[in-house]
A protein has these predicted regions:
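Asp-based, Mg2+/Mn2+-dependent phosphohydrolase catalytic module
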Residues: 2-30, 100-103, 127, 131-134, ...
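N-terminal helical cap/lid subdomain that shapes the substrate entry/recognition surface
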Residues: 19-128, 136
Length: 244
């Protein structure tokens, strides 16, 4: 029995290796995957109103917002912009902000975001991971639901040189989880769906969108909160190389 199990395991490894050898490109979400919310900045903003919220509490509460997006979209909601609005409400309430103050804070953060994105923290290991992937010969691309600023943000943060293609939903006119936004990226890269992998942090938007486009994906789950998701999860893009 042990020999049979070992043989089966070896066969699985070999099949995975052959599959990995086909991969020519890697696609990434932007916010929550390459750049993260500036929780320290947000905590300082709250302190101006006399509210003591530490950055770590805000970071952990954010999962509630992502879960709200998943609940809405997986229940059939089609309006992604509406879902993102519920994200902020659920997140801030989970962080301890009274419901009647959420709109006010949301407007303030929206103004900050429009001036200089709130997703502005590039975490340790990101540049090194992208350099390894680029040096290994992979084409790299970003596929992001955004407001037209992603290319400028990648330049500001020093990420732009790594990417061959940047797809911003505001510019191309279609947003995840619609598979068409992935098809645009594939066409510009000159690759097929089975030659690509994608990494993103919101299951209903990133993972289900990639699946609909025929692309295998990895869910970014830094704090192991997506326990209900039966899907390949990683904590950081560093885990993408070697491919798993």
């Amino acid at each position: 029995m042990t020999k049979i199990n070992d043989k089966a395991k070896k066969g699985t490894v070999e099949r995975r290796k052959r599959k990995d050898e086909k991969i020519k490109a890697l696609l990434f979400d932007f916010g929550g995957t390459l750049a993260f919310l500036d929780y320290e900045l947000l905590a300082r903003e709250f302190s101006r109103d006399g509210r003591k919220l530490d950055a770590l509490a805000l970071e952990h509460a954010e999962y509630v917002g992502r879960q709200k997006i998943d609940d809405l979209l997986m229940a059939g909601e089609k309006d992604v912009v509406l879902a993102y609005g519920h994200f902020f409400r659920a997140w801030l309430e989970a962080a301890g902000i009274p419901a009647e103050e959420v709109v006010e804070h949301g407007e303030r953060f929206g103004a900050i975001h429009r001036e200089a994105t709130l997703w502005r923290v590039v975490r340790p290991g990101t540049f090194e991971a992208l350099e390894r992937l680029k040096s290994a010969g992979y084409k790299l691309a970003i596929v992001s639901n955004a407001e037209g600023q992603v290319e400028a943000d990648t330049k500001r943060f020093g990420l732009a040189p790594f990417f061959d293609v940047i797809i911003d939903s505001h510019i191309v006119g279609v947003a995840k989880p619609d598979p068409r936004i992935f098809h645009i990226a594939l066409e510009r890269l000159g690759v097929a769906p089975d030659e690509v992998r994608f990494a993103g942090d919101i299951f209903s938007i990133d993972i289900l969108g990639a699946r609909a486009a025929g692309i295998e994906a990895r869910l970014i789950d830094q704090h192991s909160r997506y326990h209900w998701v039966d899907h390949h999860k990683i904590r950081h893009i560093e885990e993408l190389h070697p491919l798993k």
